C-alpha cells in the first residue's frame, strides 16, 4: 500500500510548512500544491545555495519527484515565469517534473492594475 502525507497549515502565515515539505519531499514521488497564491515564499538551502520558492513545490529539487500545481492555486504568470527562470539559472532542471492544472485561476498584470485603480478611487 502506498502512503501519503498531507501537510495543512491553519495559521495563514509562516508556520514552517516549506521546510517540512522540503524535508519529506525526497521520500515521495510527488509533491502537490493545492491552493493559495504566490506567497511570501519559503527559503530552502540546497548545497549551501539559497532558494526562495513562492509557487513551485519544493520537491522540484529531486529528480524522482513530480511537482503539481493544483486547480486551487491562483497562478501569477509573471511570478511563475520569474521563479522558473531563477531555478534554471541555478541549474535546477524542471523539464518533465512540473505539472500545472489547466483549471488554475490566473492572476494577470491587469488584475494588479484594477486593484491599484480601485484603491485610488476608494482612498483618495
Task: Describe each model-derived feature in a short phrase.
Residues 2-5:
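Extreme N-terminal starter segment of soluble prokaryotic enzymes
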Residues 123-124:
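Conserved small/polar residues in nucleotide/adenosyl-binding loops
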Residues 120:
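Catalytic core of tubulin tyrosine ligase-like
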Residues 8-46, 59:
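N-terminal basic/disordered segments at the start of proteins
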Residues 41-116:
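Glycine-rich, N-terminal phosphate-binding loop and its surrounding beta-alpha-beta segment
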Amino acid at each position: 500500500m502506498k502512503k501519503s502525507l498531507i501537510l495543512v497549515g491553519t495559521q495563514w502565515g509562516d508556520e514552517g510548512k516549506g521546510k517540512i515539505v522540503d524535508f519529506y519531499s525526497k521520500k515521495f514521488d510527488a509533491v502537490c500544491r493545492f491552493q493559495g497564491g504566490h506567497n511570501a515564499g519559503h527559503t530552502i538551502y540546497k548545497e549551501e545555495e539559497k532558494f526562495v520558492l513562492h509557487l513551485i513545490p519544493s520537491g522540484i529539487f529531486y529528480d524522482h519527484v513530480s511537482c503539481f500545481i493544483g486547480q486551487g492555486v491562483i497562478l501569477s504568470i509573471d511570478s511563475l515565469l520569474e521563479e522558473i527562470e531563477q531555478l534554471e539559472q541555478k541549474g535546477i532542471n524542471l523539464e518533465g517534473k512540473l505539472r500545472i492544472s489547466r483549471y488554475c485561476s490566473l492572476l494577470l498584470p491587469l488584475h494588479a492594475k484594477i486593484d491599484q485603480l480601485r484603491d485610488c478611487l476608494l482612498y483618495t
